[in-house]
Amino acid sequence: MPIITLPDGSQRHFDNPVSTLEVAQSIGPGLAKATIAGRVNGARVDACDLIEHDASLEIITTKDEVDGLEIVRHSCAHLLGHALKQLYPNAKMAIGPTIDSGFYYDIDLEQSLSQEDLEKIEARMVELAKTKYAVVKKKVSWQEARDTFESRGESYKMEILDENVARDDRPGLYHHEEYIDMCRGPHVPHMGFCQNFKLLNIAGAYWRGNSDNKMLQRIYGTAFHDKKALQAHLTRLEEAAKRDHRKIGKQLDLFHMQQEAPGMVFWHHNGWSVFRELEIFIRHKLNEYGYQEVKGPLMMDRVLWERSGHWDKYADAMFTTSSENREYAIKPMNCPGHIQIFNQGLKSYRDLPLRMAEFGSCHRNEPSGSLHGIMRVRGFTQDDAHIFCTEDQIQQEVTSCIKMVYDTYTTFGFQNIVVKLSTRPEKRVGSDEIWDKSEQALIDSLKAMDIPFEIQEGEGAFYGPKIEFTLYDCLDRAWQCGTVQLDFNLPTRLGATYVGESNERLIPVMIHRAILGSLERFIGILIEEYAGFFPTWLAPEQAVVVNITDKQADYAHEVAQKLQKCGIRAKADLRNEKIGFKIREHTLKRVPYMLVCGDQEMEAGEIAVRTRKGKDLGKFKLDDFIAHIQAEIASRKLNLEE
């Protein structure tokens, strides 16, 4: 009979197979009431599943913000299915998984759902959840599951069974009163746990993500353990909507996208100014950290991509073209090109480390449904670098990369950075000795800099361990940007060698390094982080000179010209409009400084300075203001005096 070991080491003996809920009941009614599911020997199970042998058990409760919340959200997806089938009996249910901060359900319904319909569906979900009905799990044979869904006309569930479930498996069917769904689970024991949810929006999604399949309707929702957490999340979503880079990009005339070039960015003058400033900043860092900048071809013969191994792994994501009976691929990444540059001319150990960087224009054929403004595109620019070094140089080079990452991120104001180290997978290339040495070098580099990190066992690429840097923005959203990836494979495949101290030919270790990742995506992140209020050094327009009447027009024009000659992005607004109108317009455009020229300022050779947040900085002599703004730009100061 089972002996159950709890997390505190205590044991409970039972005469018969016992469920997680029954164990909780044996401890106390309060725990039983809060029990959502269990974790038996590390595997999640439903609260009703019987434990037949000795096992360790963790009880998942409403206090669990990871597994407990994920289970509640998954059960809310089933609740959504229950409500949908009551309101739209002809709807065919596809899949309803959890995602970050929520869940969705894909449905096949002839009627296009509106926001009004969404409110009706949510109201029905509330009615159902209030009854706190029991969720009943039944393990059935494959055939019984298929017969169940065939009788209900659920063709998508039948397809999942046919293609993804073994015939000898026993699928779990979850009964929500008259509604039945299929899932691996676990799920909540009753709907009393699903009281704090919100349906968010509707989008289109191809079945199985394949554009050759039917377009389904995807309903997104979110759920939390309590009302306070739900409301806080909804408030963050409202703020995120205000900061949406697509909306602000249009408002500030930064860029646009159009149907004739899906996933490709049309940079306008203002947006391109931001892009170029980022390039200048990264180039400054490249010089500081000893990189040489190179430029590889946009397109290379298929033969090279086959030799590198990318053709086998990335062919579907590569754009191709043919000419003179040769097939070419537009590069999805820069690394094979950088090895071609390294291979030109004999290299000695004295030439290493060799740090090669490129603002590489890359293209990947991302699914149309995944494209999102400039955050997820098909054409993008990588601030990519590859370091060729010896095994003994790994740690010093990794340390330098990490310093560069932190130097860069702190310049933009990102302080909350989560670091993950991925170690060797089961299937890999390279000796255990080089893996030992490399993993230890990464660990030592992080420890030497007092950087906390999480080890992801077995999550490294087959060709080397990796460090990932994830930024958390002002809305606590995670953005994985920087990587430091060791590679023992590609230099071998593409014939990269150097002459060692003993005159032997050796293969260099290659370190892939990205700081921003994609410049397009990083600009999108910055737009939303700053809500369009770029720091002065990045702002497309750094100052605007406005006159009060036509009398000061020439003076305002002269002021703007002098600012421009001093390298400041400035212009004069000499329109015959009221001063209040002009100030409001440029405030909405997030111009850092507005320089007002009236009669007094013109006579004294001064300007009246105010910030975009409405702060009056008083009057400045023009040269004094130029010195002030130049110092702010040169220091890449984050915040204005506002």
From Swiss-Prot:
Database matches in PROSITE patterns: AA_TRNA_LIGASE_II, TGS
Q: What is its main location?
A: cytoplasm
Pfam families on file: HGTP_anticodon, TGS, tRNA-synt_2b, tRNA_SAD
According to its UniProt record, the EC number is 6.1.1.3
The free-text note explaining how the cofactor binds reads: Binds 1 zinc ion per subunit.
Instruction: From the UniProt record, give one GO term of the biological process aspect.
Output: threonyl-tRNA aminoacylation
Query: According to its UniProt record, which protein family does this protein belong to?
Result: Belongs to the class-II aminoacyl-tRNA synthetase family.
Q: What does the subunit section of this Swiss-Prot or TrEMBL entry state?
A: Homodimer.
Protein name (record): Threonine--tRNA ligase
Instruction: Name the species this protein comes from.
Output: Vibrio cholerae serotype O1 (strain ATCC 39541 / Classical Ogawa 395 / O395)
